[in-house]
Amino acid sequence: MSALHSIPHRSKKLPPLRVGVGGPVGSGKTTLVEMLCKSMRERWDLVVVTNDIYTKEDQRLLTVSGALEPERIMGVETGGCPHTAIREDASINLEAVDRMLAKFPNADIVFIESGGDNLAATFSPELSDLTIYVIDVAAGEKIPRKGGPGITKSDLFVINKTDLAPHVGADLAVMEADTQRMRPAHASSRPYVMTNLKTRAGLAEVVSFIERRGLLHAA
């Protein structure tokens, strides 16, 4: 990992970009955050806030994987419904973000990983500037056409674990067609990406989306 002083920080005319990563339990949110950190940490100054209901397991997993230095990863225990902590009452996460930015004032990006939740989960605009919603193919071919704010309103929709399609009888072409129908503006304002994070397939597209839509190269 490069020394942080050598990283070209985002223009300080702009506040840190806050990227919310949501999705059901087991969809691959933590793996995506891990791989985003490892792909982007040479170029950008990163910190992470993870959410779990009763533990700090995702913080532990990211730390063990070496995604970032341990002090750059903070876990919060939300209790109750995980969507409440990112939407109706985001105070616990807002406080965590403030604490991380006090420790790392040059941070360019704050990744906020929600606890696993249902298709209705969304991030408060006070907490997240960009939202990424992750589902996995193993949950069923029907998931994209079920709709819900995570699928229809997220800035980027990620269909993960594409390698499992033949094992669960899912047709990726059907999932893609349903996604295009549920996200009619997908080609411009609401894109989607098919990923297999085991092989890094699709990861570069997610990174490019964050850098482009997050104005990370703005002067």
UniProtKB/Swiss-Prot annotation:
It comes from the Bacteria. One of its GO terms (cellular component) is cytoplasm. It is found in: Cytoplasm. HAMAP family: UreG (MF_01389). One of its GO terms (biological process) is urea catabolic process. GTP binds at residues 23-30. Gene3D superfamilies: P-loop containing nucleotide triphosphate hydrolases (3.40.50.300). The lineage of its organism: Bacteria, Pseudomonadati, Pseudomonadota, Betaproteobacteria, Burkholderiales. Facilitates the functional incorporation of the urease nickel metallocenter. This process requires GTP hydrolysis, probably effectuated by UreG. Pfam families: cobW. GO terms for molecular function: GTP binding; GTPase activity; nickel cation binding. Homodimer. UreD, UreF and UreG form a complex that acts as a GTP-hydrolysis-dependent molecular chaperone, activating the urease apoprotein by helping to assemble the nickel containing metallocenter of UreC. The UreE protein probably delivers the nickel. Its main location: cytoplasm. Keywords: Chaperone, Cytoplasm, GTP-binding, Nickel insertion, Nucleotide-binding. This is Urease accessory protein UreG.
